[in-house]
Amino acid sequence: ADTDDEGSVRGFSFITAPYEAEIGFATRLRDTAFKRVLRNLAPGAEVKLDAPYGDFRLHNNESRPAVFVIGGIGATPVRSIVAQATHDRTGHRILLLHANRSIDDAPFQADFLRFAEQNPNFRFVPVFTDAVPPLWKGESGRIAAATIRRWVPQLAEPIWYLSGPEGMVKAMRRLLVEMEIDEDDIRTEEFAGY
């Protein structure tokens, strides 16, 4: 098969939750040899999967809220986490601040809106940085300390999850540390190359 300098193996975050019947993942289909092969796979094609890795998952203590501050494709692992929490009816209070350039660039919007309808413990806050929809009354611009404080009055209470492009995740981590959030309460998932 066609390949590139990185070979034919990649790591992906699942978008599907354990209860869902199919396994799914998301990626941006750039014009690389690997992505061309991936794009041209026929439905039902056999692929080799390795065991799941990583620890970007919802914490066990339901008394502590979870706050996800994510950008763009960083929604990939969060979609599966929120789907499973909604399915299991966990007691976790979950807030998702999801930044995207525009509504057209925002992955899984319909899923997150559906989860918010189904799960009284889940709040979904879309944030648009560039193209704000007409008559939009929600959040816009970059996620800043003021944005976070509007939605999270008790900053030390939650476990914080940051997911998205590497630069965004690093900037959000710095911001949270500047806001005196304990680094032990911050979990991250960086998407290199986005």
What is each residue range found by the language model?
Residues 1-46, 100-102, 127-131:
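Ferredoxin-reductase
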Residues 14, 75-87:
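Histidine-anchored nucleotide/phosphate-binding helix
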Residues 34, 93, 97-194:
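Reductase modules of NAD(P)H-dependent flavoproteins
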Residues 39, 61, 80-82, 109-110, ...:
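Short amphipathic alpha-helical segments
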Residues 51-62:
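A short, basic/flexible loop-to-alpha-helix module at the beginning of a structural domain
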Residues 60-64, 155-156:
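Short helix-loop-beta connector
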